[in-house]
């Protein structure tokens, strides 16, 4: 779609890329196309949001697994950097995304061997494997989540991740319930 319409991303606030590496869901070999990877980098750099779940932009190419590692602020260890020290493990549990989390976040199976790059805020790590991270990229923001099985609590966490990545934290309490077990739907045009 991006190749057919270079202005496609202009109407978006946040892109969500979910799935395992080298699948149609995450893009697979399409990440080798510089038009596509550059368009998404430009979108985030100029203020857009990007949320990656699982192995987002995952395709082994040019020494990386995550082709958007610089955007996400995380990379998957594949043996190329085993001898590099990785010091960024400090968690930031008070981050906006986690403020409703009253229990440990459920990442399901999650992913192994994910590490944070310098400048990334690690929100949750388990056994020195990043499960959730937030990263500024230019004027934009990216969030990495290792897995998001459906639950009311995870729905709220994902909602907060979307708002944060879109620079829309102030919209949190628009059509909002303090109880994350309740979802609020508003049909403004219908007056309901």
Show which residues each predicted segment covers.
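A general structural motif
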Residues: 11-12, 47
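Residue-level marker of intrinsically disordered, low-complexity segments enriched
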Residues: 14-16, 95, 103, 112, ...
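Short acidic loop-to-helix transition motifs that present clustered carboxylates
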Residues: 1-4
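A short, aliphatic-rich alpha-helical micro-motif
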Residues: 9-10, 37
């Amino acid at each position: 779609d991006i190749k057919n319409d270079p202005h496609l991303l202009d109407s978006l606030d946040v892109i969500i890329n979910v799935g395992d590496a080298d699948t149609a869901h995450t893009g697979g070999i399409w990440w080798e196309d510089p038009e596509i990877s550059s368009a998404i980098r430009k979108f985030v750099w100029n203020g857009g949001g990007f949320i990656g779940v699982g192995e987002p932009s995952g395709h082994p190419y040019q020494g990386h697994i995550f082709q958007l590692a610089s955007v996400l602020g995380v990379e998957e260890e594949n043996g190329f950097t085993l001898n590099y020290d990785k010091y960024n493990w400090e968690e930031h549990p008070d981050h906006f995304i986690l403020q409703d989390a009253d229990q440990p976040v459920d990442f399901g199976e999650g992913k192994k061997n994910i590490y944070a790059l310098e400048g990334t805020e690690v929100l949750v790590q388990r056994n020195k494997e990043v499960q959730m991270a937030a990263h500024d990229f230019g004027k934009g923001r990216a969030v990495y989540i290792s897995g998001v099985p459906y639950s009311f609590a995870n729905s709220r966490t994902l909602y907060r991740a979307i708002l944060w990545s879109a620079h829309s934290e102030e919209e949190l309490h628009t059509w909002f319930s303090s109880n994350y077990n309740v979802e609020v739907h508003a049909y403004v045009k219908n007056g309901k």
